[in-house]
């Protein structure tokens, strides 16, 4: 204990000088410019011997002293700054101490005193403050980059909101840079976006610079994945002829449920099974990817039969591009971030939803629930109406979502022979009917076998192909010309209002095997040339006819080899309905 503290304690014990006031309720020092420090303070309240007891000390004022050698130790130490008796005057406004030396640290001690002249000289921390005069605040900005291979540069800007003045620095690597901000001015720090990285332009909240102060900001640049696969498209005819490019160069493709190099990659996290209700802005909850009988979190069993909503796969937005090469190959790229020339799989939505099961219908309303027979024997238009009856955000088996699943299949498995890569699906010629929905609830997220009876599952979607054919909406073939819309409000069976025309399919195909795809962003896997076989090129067949035709995809329970990821039936009339043709519920995101 120092002498002043000891003296104070003794004085209290022997009651030589009466009761001293309590400590300051507020005492702060801040640099205002290169030669001025501002003090804000609030004197102690009057003190009492006990709660509700007699008055012990009445606060009259505060004496503040200053030194450059350390905190003044008593009421005579250092230089007098102010003797204030207007209590509360400087609680929210500065008492300015002028004429100071830039860069020198100044120490202040407050000595509150009573109406009988008793000072609090306890040197309590509440009675001390210090600051260094400086007109500027130092601002550091740190750039972190998780992977630099596509990083070009970002421009960091410190902008003065008051004057519009700004200072910029061009950054090409991970580093920390320093700026200076004028005291009392308002600023914002920004960083421009970098192509290929997940974050867009970055910005801080506005802040007011404090003289002599410092603050630090960090901007993290996380590179989005970019995967590529170059595949045969009418060249050597070998289904397994492909080459992985970009971030998946050197990968080993998936095989049935074994994801090999794709295991744990972020792209698989873009697909999540969930329960979602009409009008909801988010799912009720998510499911265990490899066992729909369990929630992703928590021990409560999920309800897959309708009460908790429809069982659907939530697909996050990604971008893709198809390039048709000059050597009878094509290249598919899938990017986590938007790049020039790339197309969003799901438009401007953050997420979209595709039924985990084939559609069922109850009371004229389409559902995606477990434990029921797939709905069949309706026209495409009728199924469209059933989907709309579920809610304005619903549609049936959107072409743009089917396109996403086709692209993902090719990227993950490489080979165009899907029945070999992931399973035959329910397709054996001896099958007499479709299997019910939910028979693969406990199977892995990607699953299949070679028996032809048990179905298959890809990215959570049961019977991606096989079991029942599925109508596809948003695509209509008019005299072999592909008419496409990505706006479900335009869905019809004639395609006259569809905004995209995407090439032609081969005329007169009658179970002809596909040799070459259009390989464009709008029509990546709509056929352009036939002449393959069940074991060459795309290993899947095509039927076409003239006139206006509604598309059917995938194959059915007894088609043997006639099912697959690229199997198209493009010869059906709008009036066609069949016991082997169903649909699938799809859904847009509902904004909050």
Kindly give the residue locations of the regions a language model identified.
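Structured interaction patches on ligand/partner-binding surfaces of diverse proteins
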Residues: 126-136, 194-223
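C-terminal, surface-exposed recognition/capping segments
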Residues: 227, 403, 424-440, 464-477, ...
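Beta-strand-rich modules
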Residues: 97-119
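Extracellular low-complexity, O-glycosylation-prone stalks/linkers
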Residues: 46-84
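Surface-exposed interfaces of beta-sheet-rich extracellular modules
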Residues: 115-121, 179-207
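Pro/Thr/Ser/Gly-rich low-complexity, intrinsically disordered linker/stalk tracts
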Residues: 13-58, 102, 118-136
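Short aromatic-cysteine micro-motif
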Residues: 302, 306-309, 337-464, 468
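Short, low-complexity N-terminal tether/leader segments at secretion or assembly junctions of large
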Residues: 1-21, 113, 130-136, 218-223
């Amino acid at each position: 204990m120092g002498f002043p503290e000891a003296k104070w304690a003794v004085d209290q014990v022997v009651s030589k000088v009466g009761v001293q006031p309590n400590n300051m309720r507020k005492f702060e020092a801040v640099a205002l410019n290169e030669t001025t420090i501002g003090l804000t303070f609030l004197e102690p309240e009057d003190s009492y011997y006990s709660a509700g007891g007699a008055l012990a000390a009445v606060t009259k004022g505060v004496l503040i002293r200053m030194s450059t050698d350390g905190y003044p130790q008593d009421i005579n130490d250092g230089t007098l700054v102010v003797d204030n008796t207007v209590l509360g005057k400087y609680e929210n406004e500065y008492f300015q101490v002028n004429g100071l030396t830039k860069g020198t640290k100044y120490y202040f001690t407050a000595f509150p005193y009573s109406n009988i002249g008793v000072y609090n000289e306890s040197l309590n921390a509440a009675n001390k403050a210090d600051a260094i005069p400086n007109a500027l605040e130092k601002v550091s900005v740190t750039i972190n980059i998780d992977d630099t291979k596509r990083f070009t540069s970002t421009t960091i800007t410190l902008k003065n909101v008051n004057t519009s003045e700004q200072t910029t620095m061009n950054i090409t690597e991970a580093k920390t840079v320093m700026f200076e901000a004028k005291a009392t001015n308002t600023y914002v720090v920004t960083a421009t976006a970098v192509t290929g990285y997940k974050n867009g332009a970055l910005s801080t909240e506005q802040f007011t610079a404090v003289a002599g102060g410092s603050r630090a900001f960090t901007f993290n640049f996380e590179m989005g994945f970019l995967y590529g696969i170059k595949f045969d498209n009418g060249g050597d005819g070998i289904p397994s002829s492909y080459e992985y490019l970009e971030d998946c160069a050197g990968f080993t493709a998936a095989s049935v449920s074994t994801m090999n190099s794709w295991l744990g990659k972020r792209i698989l996290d873009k697909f999540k099974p969930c329960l979602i209700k009409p009008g909801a802005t988010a799912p009720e909850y998510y499911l265990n990817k490899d066992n729909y009988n369990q929630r992703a979190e928590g021990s409560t069993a999920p309800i897959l039969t309708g009460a908790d909503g429809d069982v659907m796969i939530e697909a996050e937005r990604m971008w893709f591009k198809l390039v048709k090469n000059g050597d009878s190959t094509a290249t598919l790229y899938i990017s986590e971030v938007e790049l020039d020339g790339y197309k969003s799989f799901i438009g401007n939505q953050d997420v979209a939803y595709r039924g985990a099961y084939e559609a069922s219908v109850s009371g004229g309303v389409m559902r995606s629930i477990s434990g029921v027979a797939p709905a069949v024997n309706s026209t495409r238009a009728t199924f469209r109406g059933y989907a709309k009856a579920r809610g304005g955000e619903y549609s049936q088996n959107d072409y743009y979502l089917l396109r996403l699943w086709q692209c993902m299949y090719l990227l993950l498995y490489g080979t165009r022979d899907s029945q070999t890569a992931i399973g035959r699906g329910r397709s054996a010629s001896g099958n007499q009917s479709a299997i019910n929905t939910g028979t693969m609830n406990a199977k892995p997220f990607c699953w299949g076998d070679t028996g032809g009876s048990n179905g298959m599952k890809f990215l959570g979607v049961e019977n991606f192909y096989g079991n029942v054919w599925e109508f596809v909406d948003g695509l209509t073939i008019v005299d072999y010309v592909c008419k496409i819309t990505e706006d479900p409000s335009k869905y019809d069976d004639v395609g006259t209002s569809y905004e995209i025309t995407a090439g032609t399919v081969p005329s007169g195909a009658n179970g002809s095997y596909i040799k070459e795809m259009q390989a464009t962003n709008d029509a990546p896997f709509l056929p352009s040339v036939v002449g393959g076989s069940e074991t060459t090129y795309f290993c899947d067949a095509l039927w076409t006819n003239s006139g206006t035709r509604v598309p059917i995809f995938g194959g059915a329970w007894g088609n043997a080899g006639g099912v697959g990821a690229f199997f198209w039936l493009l010869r059906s009339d709008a009036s066609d309905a069949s016991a082997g043709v169903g649909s699938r519920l799809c859904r847009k995101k509902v904004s909050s």
